[in-house]
Amino acid sequence: DAAISALENFIATPTNKIIARDYLYLGLAKMKKANNLETKVVDAVVFDAGVAQLKKAVEMEITMTNDLSEIGKKFYEQKLFKEAAVIYEIAVTNVNSKNYLLDNFYLGNSLYFKNTRKDVVKADPIELQKADVAFGNVITAAPSTQDAYIFRARTNNLLENDEMIIKYYQQYIDVVTAKGEEEMAKPAVKTKFIESYNAIGAAYANTDKVKAKEYFGKTLALDPLNDYATQSLKLLK
């Protein structure tokens, strides 16, 4: 509180020459105060006040975005995805930031995980579209980032966009396949391939039963006892 008061008094004094970093430090101090590590509850009023200061810092000097990744990551690691997304959304306004790629990835993930919490009744399509754009920015900057494809596909699954579900899950498969057998043999990757084949099969089910059966067949080639693929094939007959 002492640091916040001192900074607020300094900024409020008309004769002082204020620089962007003054607003940045005030914003970061408010973020720290808002984030109660013991209760894991964020004080929304203090947090929003901190966000306002961070925005002032970035408006004055765009390179201040370079300092936002770390604070965004702290909220992200605490699974405070709403707050993390707000910070990363400011961070990615600087396309020349050294953290631009990672900031977009964490922005997309924050919005995705915020909308997949157990207490979410209905996912927010506007937030999911923002996540889709963020993952797209990662893919444009680093086309071999395979996790960006899988999360973009999952995001479009929540949006129930069959065309994009097929497109991005297939792109995930293609990018990983291009990396070779060693990558494809990893257990986590095999699980994601099964997820991809099942999702593509489900997306095709209403429009192209032949394609749907093909992809469910690919699932069973990897996991012969996969219940979802087995039941789906029965329904498609």
Model-derived segments and their meaning:
Residues K218-P224:
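Short, exposed beta-strand-loop hairpins at the edges of beta-sheets
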Residues D1-T207, K211, Y228-K237:
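Alpha-solenoid helical repeat scaffolds
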